[in-house]
Amino acid sequence: MASGRDERPPWRLGRLLLLMCLLLLGSSARAAHIKKAEATTTTTSAGAEAAEGQFDRYYHEEELESALREAAAAGLPGLARLFSIGRSVEGRPLWVLRLTAGLGSLIPEGDAGPDAAGPDAAGPLLPGRPQVKLVGNMHGDETVSRQVLIYLARELAAGYRRGDPRLVRLLNTTDVYLLPSLNPDGFERAREGDCGFGDGGPSGASGRDNSRGRDLNRSFPDQFSTGEPPALDEVPEVRALIEWIRRNKFVLSGNLHGGSVVASYPFDDSPEHKATGIYSKTSDDEVFKYLAKAYASNHPIMKTGEPHCPGDEDETFKDGITNGAHWYDVEGGMQDYNYVWANCFEITLELSCCKYPPASQLRQEWENNRESLITLIEKVHIGVKGFVKDSITGSGLENATISVAGINHNITTGRFGDFYRLLVPGTYNLTVVLTGYMPLTVTNVVVKEGPATEVDFSLRPTVTSVIPDTTEAVSTASTVAIPNILSGTSSSYQPIQPKDFHHHHFPDMEIFLRRFANEYPNITRLYSLGKSVESRELYVMEISDNPGVHEPGEPEFKYIGNMHGNEVVGRELLLNLIEYLCKNFGTDPEVTDLVHNTRIHLMPSMNPDGYEKSQEGDSISVIGRNNSNNFDLNRNFPDQFVQITDPTQPETIAVMSWMKSYPFVLSANLHGGSLVVNYPFDDDEQGLATYSKSPDDAVFQQIALSYSKENSQMFQGRPCKNMYPNEYFPHGITNGASWYNVPGGMQDWNYLQTNCFEVTIELGCVKYPLEKELPNFWEQNRRSLIQFMKQVHQGVRGFVLDATDGRGILNATISVAEINHPVTTYKTGDYWRLLVPGTYKITASARGYNPVTKNVTVKSEGAIQVNFTLVRSSTDSNNESKKGKGASSSTNDASDPTTKEFETLIKDLSAENGLESLMLRSSSNLALALYRYHSYKDLSEFLRGLVMNYPHITNLTNLGQSTEYRHIWSLEISNKPNVSEPEEPKIRFVAGIHGNAPVGTELLLALAEFLCLNYKKNPAVTQLVDRTRIVIVPSLNPDGRERAQEKDCTSKIGQTNARGKDLDTDFTNNASQPETKAIIENLIQKQDFSLSVALDGGSMLVTYPYDKPVQTVENKETLKHLASLYANNHPSMHMGQPSCPNKSDENIPGGVMRGAEWHSHLGSMKDYSVTYGHCPEITVYTSCCYFPSAARLPSLWADNKRSLLSMLVEVHKGVHGFVKDKTGKPISKAVIVLNEGIKVQTKEGGYFHVLLAPGVHNIIAIADGYQQQHSQVFVHHDAASSVVIVFDTDNRIFGLPRELVVTVSGATMSALILTACIIWCICSIKSNRHKDGFHRLRQHHDEYEDEIRMMSTGSKKSLLSHEFQDETDTEEETLYSSKH
């Protein structure tokens, strides 16, 4: 390792000259013990079987590639892959030969060329195979390693072919990479026979260094470095190697050198940088000693520990190994870089005393090192290995951290969740940690000598796991370990500083941003929020270890610069910050930790138009301050105290939409004109310059101080003495309104309308300083910028979960007692709440749940993680009493593995960028559908062609005919298009209701082809087609389409049908047009759809029902949710700025609007669909131009593809259920009423499905002959809620219980019968009097005579002369009669 590591001290040069003399006298004059060792070396190795010619010369550049190809050819097909990881200074390829079994089935034939340095050049990684690399010829004049690795390649390949059990086992289980020459330029300068420094000239002349005179083994980032490493442009070989290491998960490595015979191990240097004698121990010192001994003990000379190299005859190494720094200090070495910044354990191997021995010695050198090299590769299988997987999906988890108790060195899992942790025999406790998952520890893992112990970890996602002890009032909170995030850099390593200091006008800034996005694609994503008034892009650079994705549990941060166009320092600082973060990621621990644990968004310029009008050197003017419409953007936001009457500007709209779309936690708005950090509130109710305190005043002061205290000039508090001599800000911070009143400011809007805490930072007294002053601004602010970002990891963080299914709850509220400022959870239930140290009572609540309160203590460093698990509210638990015995219940049937797999797919596709992965895995060959517009004839042929080519998943039907007798085609795509499957949701896509807007027609044809092309090729598309009934009606108005004219953006020709009727006004119960009747009768009324998407043209937005003017909109929340979903998946629609030529100032918040608010009219298709078809329908306006040129179709498809696919995913959410009676019999045509408004009917088989916005919804189920059922259901944003409703037979009569009705009826009948009996009895008694009494029966003439007599008598006494006849017979009456 001696000269392989460093130039020797001057007093050793004489000894090296002596070595030269010995070579001239003859190479046979060797030490006696070396000769003896050589004599006893086995000569029957497989290396001797190779052709004699392979040892007779060194392979120079023109032969190296051929030699490696020949080595690869010695094995079986599919065993080897040759590729280059980059080029040297002089353009020579840095060849790598990969050897492992099974490559043939995974990669195309042929090898990658010398320029194929990307991650795909080597072919895909293989799960379960640890990666080992051996690197040779790092110093160009140390050549034995170059040759030995070529011989090793031949040995491994040939041994595998001949069936050597050891080598077959090795290549079946290990992924081996051999890099024979890292410094091919130096090798070409070196001279055979030069064992030291040649003629005593500089090392560059000898070939040691690269072509720019850089020692590659002093050019890596170093943890103990006192200076900057060489710029990577100076050492392209090092840059290539670093990038190669980053792209892979190497486990074990050997760095092969020359100049001694010893195995050295980390660390190579120490903080003291003493030349020699300092043992710099790693946390894995025992492992490194084990690996070094494994090599040395199999080397006949190395194992003696006495190499007896000329000039260092007395140098000895116990067991043939040494600690690098103990031997001598090497700063910037490769082996330390591998250990500190990668997963890789690397040792350095000095193979021979002579650096460039004569070729005649090559055979002996190979024999000396063969067994050691193979043994070292085999040692990758010691320790512990296994997989880390998601407990729900079973998929491997990448970048999970594996820690071993008592060893302060972690590794991370590979792409498949696989890990390999090298350990010496012993008993260990292993812990796995990954953001978004519950940590897991396995104790008492026993590692024995020999093969690794296998330990697999199954991590429970925090967003899908039920946390126990939900009723506990006090949380057992744990601090999340985020290394180095809150403490500064943990070592003396000096990060790379930016070098690009000049004023970037818009074209320069655009090039700068694109360059870094291209150079660092693994950690950057460049995107635009929209456009300024003058159509300049509002760029944002995202920097994250997983760009484009919100990682659950990871906070999001933003900086915004150049809001006032003439305040330019913030713009340049953010460009510097981008360069700083990109160049130091992976080398600087502080930057690496920050990027790993934070999603960072940097917006260099919010006002690019104003910047272009500004003038360098400006200190106090307002030229360029405002945007191109002359509005101050920092007075343009809605304000809590003042009504802002100025029109909202495009830049403001774009930024507000952006802030609503991401879960930002912390932000700063960078300004100029003073030197201070000001915090909310910026104004007050009276409009006075007075302290306007926010509820989080203490938090704002803390985060403001975190910036100012790192800027010494700012912290002094007297910023601009010449301009404002009386201005003083204690510690460089101030309340905004206390300084001066600013209504309509951005920082207040952030705090009040989002979860984000924002401050405004004034960066200097001069608004537009001279270019030469920019380096000073960076130096003054660089530490402040980093420290402020770290504040995003303060306070409390965690998840709010549903106790029923463990899912995260969206929009749950986190409130802190005595601080009147709640925050809400993001999609996966994660939240972040900035707080100063102290003890707090924190409550999590959500609609439909019982709140939970916990006491939490916040410390000064690190965020406290506190998870809340909420139980559904008592309205759910009390449903039994409301519903009786036939209660409905929410279920998630996971018994079917395919159902569970599909549910997981829907959740994955619903995640941020989930649809991106679907599209990336899909075929993009859609030229047939998008190179031109389709006439009616072409469209018909195209649809027939799809059916002919994909008959098993397509069915073409004719819904009816147009006025001019053209067919209105309907294409169904599903796995069983001719079979009724009522349990599957149905979605329809319709287009062309206005014939002059045919873009929608072409998009639907492209969608149909996309689905067919990818069926059985893309798993996600296949499952969506298998489980969805997709109906596509591409042209509702074929007659109008035939009359429309291409490239006419405003013409109304073709808008109506052949009779001049706008079909979107004819959807009524008395529809008059044949096209309308066909759609109503054969599409809307006959088929049960869950969702409908109509495509139109003339603007860029989505409208939802109703188009008719109505006072209230039933189910508005769901309808708007569906419209927003489409708009949010469109790259520009959600920005709300269609920028159509005839309406350039049109502002549509979120790109979504109720139809009547945009263009009110009666008889629309969407209104009819909702009212009579019970199907929600949205209308998408795809472009401002009605009929753009065909050349725009590919870009329009690209813009709408994700949104269209999002509808296919969304149709599987909401509520789906099954209605049955107590015997299990399905009940069809039952009415399901949701939220007392929406009504759907159950289909055949009792199934129903309805889309609903996420949240809690009430359900009423009604069926004839059954009791009404009531329930509640919680709808998630990424999954359907499944409901089973069981009906009881309705025993009620006239709305009353049967028992009551029977009782009352019986009582009533009894009363009626009793009454009848009484009446009958009375009548019977009267009848009996006539039968039993004694009296004279009168005749008719007697009665008549009596009447005459009575009427004619003149005396009353005459009446008494006749007896009164009575039927009674009482004694009293008899006496009365006798008396007279």
UniProtKB/Swiss-Prot annotation:
EC number annotated for this UniProt entry: 3.4.17.22
All ranges on the Cytoplasmic side of the membrane: 1321-1380
Membrane topology qualifier: Single-pass type I membrane protein
GO cellular component: extracellular exosome; extracellular space; membrane; plasma membrane
Residues with attached carbohydrate: 172, 217, 399, 410, 429, 522, 626, 811, 855, 867, 879, 955, 978, 1070, 1142
KW Cell membrane (keyword) present: yes
Residue numbers on the Extracellular membrane side: 32-1299
Signal sequence, start to end: 1-31
Domain Peptidase M14: 57-380, 502-792, 932-1211
Regions that span the bilayer: 1300-1320
Modified residues (Phosphoserine): 270, 1358, 1361
UniProt biased composition (Polar residues): 887-897
Residues that bind Zn(2+) 2: 564, 567, 671
Sites where the protein binds Zn(2+) 1: 139, 142, 257
Intervals of motif Cell attachment site: 162-164
A family per Pfam: CarboxypepD_reg
Molecular function GO terms recorded: metallocarboxypeptidase activity; serine-type carboxypeptidase activity; zinc ion binding
Lipidation (S-palmitoyl cysteine): 1317, 1321, 1323
Location of this chain's protein in the cell: Cell membrane
Modified residues (Phosphothreonine): 1368, 1370
Cofactor(s) this protein cannot do without: Zn(2+)
Record text about domains: There are 3 carboxypeptidase-like domains. Only the first two domains seem to have kept a catalytic activity.
Record-given protein name: Carboxypeptidase D
Organism: Homo sapiens (Human)
Gene: CPD
